[in-house]
Amino acid sequence: MLYGLRLYAFQEISFLDPWQLAAIFSGSCVLFISLEKRTLTGYMLTFILYSVLALFVSVWLSSAAGKAGIPIEGMVFLLFLIGGICFICLIQKIFQLTPNTVQALIPILFSALFFFLEELPALEGLPLLKWLKGLDLLLLLVGLLLLIFNENRQGGDGEGS
């Protein structure tokens, strides 16, 4: 069995590059936030960790630095992320959405964010881009399925009682 494990090419999965580690951890933060309801503290801590890791990836990958050594793409990304979170909070307050519906909007927010990231010139030609396209579609599908199942669950509760 150990011989079979040695046949895998673990050299291709290199955890020595700091930006790859940051990308893996930021991706796990996205899935952690998207797949289950969290408390406000859990959201804030995970969003802060995700923002710091994403900023690290943008600084590491960019050769052109803006103010304070942070590339302009990184700042646009963070502003888009913070704006999306504020937009979801505003929609929740205006339309009195249930927590399940808000939870379904979070993967859609990240899907829109990754769709936007694909257009940034700093990411052209990186192998990370094909993962962003796949994660974009996966999160969009997860968000839509959560919305559909939430609507079915709400509709089913009122009929049987």
Swiss-Prot record:
Residue ranges of the TM segments: 13-33, 40-60, 70-90, 104-124, 129-149
Cell compartment(s), UniProt: Mitochondrion membrane
A GO CC annotation given for this chain: mitochondrial membrane
Main location: mitochondrion
Membrane topology qualifier: Multi-pass membrane protein
Keyword hit for Transmembrane: yes
Keyword line: Membrane, Mitochondrion, Transmembrane, Transmembrane helix
Transmembrane helix recorded as keyword: yes
Extra facts: A stretch of 270 kb of the mitochondrial genome is duplicated within the centromere of chromosome 2 resulting in the duplication of the gene. The expression of this duplicated gene (At2g07719) is not demonstrated.
Name of the molecule in the record: Uncharacterized mitochondrial protein AtMg00610
Organism: Arabidopsis thaliana (Mouse-ear cress)
